[in-house]
Amino acid sequence: MQTTETQIMPNRFSFIRKRLRQKVIANLLMLLVLIPVGFLIAMPFMWMLTASLKVRGHMAEGPMLFPATFDFSNYVTAWQGAPFGRYYINTIIVAFGIVVSRLLIGSMAAYAFAILKFKGRDFLFMAYMTTMMIPFYAIVIPLYLIIRDFSWFNTYQALIVPRMVDAFGILLLRQAFIAVPKDYIDAARIDGCTHWQILWKQIIPLSLPTILTVSIFNFMFAWNDFMWPFLVANDTHMRVIQTGLQAFSGRYLTEWTYWMAGTVMTTIPPIVLFLFAQKKFISGLSRTGMKA
């Protein structure tokens, strides 16, 4: 018996050492791939940040991680060269309106497609999902004519109302709602909860990671949107951050340091938002596995 145990223990230890060695090698290989890829992804932003800190007229210098001299006055000049404060306020208002409306409407639609039972539900859902294949450019002229007929040019309504519904967000929310255990829903019905109460007191709290993921997607969309705001709200007092940056770049076309400083100011908020919410963002995506 003792001889058998002494034979098993070395074999077990050698197996563990072998598995640990394989794991270390796999992690090293992964790092060897991820570090260069991460550097390539971050390089454009690093170049933009470096260019924004260079002294005016030194843009022709070769690329470097840090400039020889830091010139933070480029940011002051860029901020004073255009009403970026107003652009930020407009963009935040528009982004808030789009995010809230898409969450409110999307949650109700996703609840209907995931929880309610009615004839033709799956067909309606698939028909609605096909709208994701229609490019925005195919409907931009009808939308533009509607905004003109309503006299909504250079208003928040023109920037928010056409963007209040999002099929992709409804898809993510529906998948999250389907994953909620039916026992919770049945218990809420036994307690006499209405559909509205079930949605807001049971489904939404259990789907917060997905709610946050959809919110981040919608915020990024609103923050980066250029074409539609450029068409319907191009007055100085109604410009959002992207159209404001375009107007600023037209004014300082040859001043690359100022242009890069303005670009950095427009990219910082989404980056900061994602850094703080990335764990919830990834968790929300992992929870929305495609379930029938």
Task: Name each model feature, range by range.
Residues I8, K18, A26-A292:
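A structural signal for multi-pass alpha-helical bundles of membrane permease subunits
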Residues M1-R21:
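Short, Lys/Arg-rich, polar N-terminal cytosolic tail immediately upstream
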